[in-house]
């Protein structure tokens, strides 16, 4: 017969040097542990069978008259083989179920990876859309700034146009005033020329009058001279000549004085008129030139204003287009964001469902590991009792498996004393956590002794916690509620610890807050902590359930009772499918349905040459005394061998009854 180490060396002949993942290593180690345990169980069963055969031979050699005893032994053997066949069937079904669960687990992991990839892609699309929205908003701000600048320039140009128009009106008034002054000066010039002509005519008239008077005077003098003596004629002529000469001289002086005065007045007025005309003409030319320049500037400003108005209209049209595009982008972004949020909610729900399923599978695996370790301890106890020496490799596998199981859970063992004074009772405490978060802030940690509750902001943005509530409840007890201050804000990536006043912590917000009105958050076996926002909606929750399992052991752990349940269907025991129990110490088969011992000669022998066996192990606990405890654990776990199974014929009826 091949030893377990030889079979393991035959199975482990795979390619060396290929790196294996931790999951694959764990699966291989679990497979080796199961194979090792099955090999040891096979050795143990072979040893039991050999001992039974030796006992039968000894009994036959001692006395031939103990046929009843031999029939009982053969009946026990037949019942054992039948139950072993049923156990193999059960092992096959459980192995298939385990393979199916492993396939479903791998499928769920693949779906989880795919959902994570899709979520990352959707988040990248969302970030791109947000970046594009920011760019469009920046472009809109720049366009608005350019529009405000153009409007300011337009207002400045309009002010300049108004100023230029006022200057043009002022210059036109000055031009009209200059024209009026020119007309007045021309009128004064004409008046002066008329006066000059009048003075010339008066002078000519005075000359004519003086000449007439002179002739009249000469005629009178001539007439008088005729009348005067001849003696005095010369005297009178000389006097007349002198008088005429004086009169002529006076008239000439007066005429010369009038002429000089008239010439001076006319020259001065003419010079003033010329200077005024020159000034008016120069002012009119300057005003006309300035008016032309003003007209040119007004035309250029009007053209520039029309161009600016066209640019403004184009900018306004472009701004309307940008606003419409921005509104469309915002609407698309809102729709995309809503779709992303809906998909994220669906993915969260699916992830939560997958995590729940994975948690169930993990609980099943932990329970399997625990029962494998229990099975190993029971088998080691029986090997020691039967003085079967296990291989060194199996001892190493048992130690490594025990280390893995001890590190897998968070259970604590404690000694308990019951009311009747029983000692040696061993308890195990297990904790189950359930957390859920639908926002940025989640419940990170709760203290079992009621000292604190810790919240953490796992996002990249600050979260305002004003008027938010933290509600703590133990089972059906009244809840304890803490309310945040109105202006409290939890920074991105930071945590806040809310201490009870009895914990002795220091109040240093925003990282540590002391609840002065409450000395403790409360403790118990079912603690539920929830975070509620200002709208009364629950955004985060963490539930912690503590379960204490009491195990009654003897002072020596190697004295545990072992029951091997062989699953089979009874057609004669009220149609029940409960297992029969095989007590390794008493070697008596008990029917799990009716509780009667098996008939040693009531079944045929089955094949016992299989290379591996498959059984279902359940562990019974007792507090004192020997024998099997009545309260066996309800769990049964299957261990399978690597060799080919040989099926025994199924019993048609209850072999015990």
UniProtKB/Swiss-Prot annotation:
Residues 429-546 form the LTD domain. It comes from Gallus gallus. It is found in: Nucleus lamina; Nucleus envelope; Nucleus, Nucleoplasm; Nucleus matrix. The modification Cysteine methyl ester is found at residue 654. Phosphorylation plays a key role in lamin organization, subcellular localization and nuclear envelope disintegration. Phosphorylation by CDK1 at Ser-21 at the onset of mitosis drives lamin disassembly and nuclear envelope breakdown. Keywords: Coiled coil, Intermediate filament, Lipoprotein, Methylation, Nucleus, Phosphoprotein, Prenylation. Residues 395-404 have a biased composition (Polar residues). Residues 70-79 are annotated as: Linker 1. This is Lamin-A. One of its GO terms (cellular component) is nuclear matrix. The keyword Nucleus applies. Residues 1-24, 383-442, 554-576, 601-621 are annotated as: Disordered. Residues 415-428 have a biased composition (Basic and acidic residues). Residues 383-657 are annotated as: Tail. Homodimer. Lamin dimers then assemble into dimeric head-to-tail polymers. Ultimately, two head-to-tail polymers assemble laterally into a protofilament with a uniformly shaped rod of 3.5 nm in diameter. Residues 218-241 are annotated as: Linker 2.
């Amino acid at each position: 017969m091949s030893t377990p180490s030889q079979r393991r060396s035959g199975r482990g002949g795979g390619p060396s040097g290929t790196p294996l993942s931790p999951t694959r290593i764990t699966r291989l180690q679990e497979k080796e542990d199961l194979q090792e345990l099955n090999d040891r169980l096979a050795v143990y069963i072979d040893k039991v069978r050999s001992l039974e055969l030796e006992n039968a031979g000894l009994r036959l050699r001692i006395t031939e008259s103990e046929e009843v005893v031999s029939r009982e032994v053969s009946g026990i053997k037949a019942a054992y083989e039948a139950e072993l066949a049923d156990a193999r069937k059960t092992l096959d079904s459980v192995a298939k179920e385990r393979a199916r669960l492993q396939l479903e687990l791998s499928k769920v992991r693949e779906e989880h990876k795919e959902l994570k990839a899709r979520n990352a892609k959707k988040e990248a699309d969302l970030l791109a859309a947000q970046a594009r929205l920011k760019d469009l908003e920046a472009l809109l701000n720049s366009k608005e700034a350019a529009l405000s600048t153009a409007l300011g320039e337009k207002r400045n140009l309009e002010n300049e146009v108004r100023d230029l128009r006022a200057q043009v009106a002022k210059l036109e008034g000055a031009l009209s005033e200059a024209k009026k002054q020119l007309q007045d000066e021309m009128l004064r010039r004409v008046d002066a020329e008329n006066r000059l002509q009048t003075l010339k005519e008066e002078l000519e008239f005075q000359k004519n009058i003086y000449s007439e008077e002179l002739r009249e005077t000469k005629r009178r003098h001539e007439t008088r001279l005729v009348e005067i003596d001849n003696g005095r004629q010369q005297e009178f002529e000389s006097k007349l000549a002198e008088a005429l000469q004086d009169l002529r001289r006076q008239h000439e002086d007066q005429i010369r004085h009038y002429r000089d005065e008239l010439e001076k007045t006319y020259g001065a007025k003419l010079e003033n008129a010329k200077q005024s005309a020159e000034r008016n003409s120069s002012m009119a030319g300057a005003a006309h030139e300035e008016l032309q320049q003003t007209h040119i500037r007004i035309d250029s400003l009007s053209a520039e204003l029309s161009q600016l108005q066209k640019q403004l209209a184009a900018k306004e049209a472009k701004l309307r287009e940008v606003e419409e595009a921005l509104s469309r982008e915002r609407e698309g972004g809102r729709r995309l964001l809503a779709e992303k949020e809906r998909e994220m909610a669906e993915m969260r729900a699916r992830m939560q469902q997958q995590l729940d399923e994975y948690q169930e599978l993990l609980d099943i695996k932990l329970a399997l590991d625990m029962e494998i370790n229990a099975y190993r301890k029971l088998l080691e106890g029986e090997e020691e009792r039967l003085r079967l020496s296990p291989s060194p490799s199996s001892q190493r596998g048992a130690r490594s498996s025990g280390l893995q199981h001890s590190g897998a859970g968070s259970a604590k063992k404690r000694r308990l004393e019951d009311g009747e004074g029983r000692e040696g009772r061993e308890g195990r405490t297990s904790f189950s956590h359930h957390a859920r978060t639908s926002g940025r802030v989640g419940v990170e940690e709760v203290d079992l002794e009621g000292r604190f509750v810790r919240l953490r902001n796992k996002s990249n943005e600050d979260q305002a916690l004003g008027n938010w509530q933290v509600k703590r409840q133990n089972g059906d007890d009244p809840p304890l509620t803490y309310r945040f201050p109105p202006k409290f804000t939890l920074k991105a990536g930071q945590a806040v610890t809310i201490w009870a006043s009895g914990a002795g912590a220091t109040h240093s917000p925003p990282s540590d807050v002391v609840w002065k009105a409450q000395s403790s958050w409360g403790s118990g076996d079912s603690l539920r902590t929830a975070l509620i926002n200002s709208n009364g909606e629950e955004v985060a929750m963490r539930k912690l359930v503590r379960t204490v399992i009491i195990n009654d052991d003897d002072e020596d752990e190697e004295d545990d009772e072992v029951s091997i349940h062989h699953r089979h269907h009874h057609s004669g025991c009220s149609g029940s499918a409960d297992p029969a129990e095989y007590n390794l110490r008493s070697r008596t088969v008990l029917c799990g349905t009716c509780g009667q011992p098996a008939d040693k000669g009531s079944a045929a022998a089955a094949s016992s040459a299989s290379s591996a066996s498959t059984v279902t192990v359940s562990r019974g606990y007792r507090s004192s005394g020997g024998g099997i405890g009545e309260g066996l654990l309800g769990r049964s776990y299957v261990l399978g061998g690597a060799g080919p199974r040989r099926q025994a014929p199924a019993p048609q009826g209850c072999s015990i009854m």
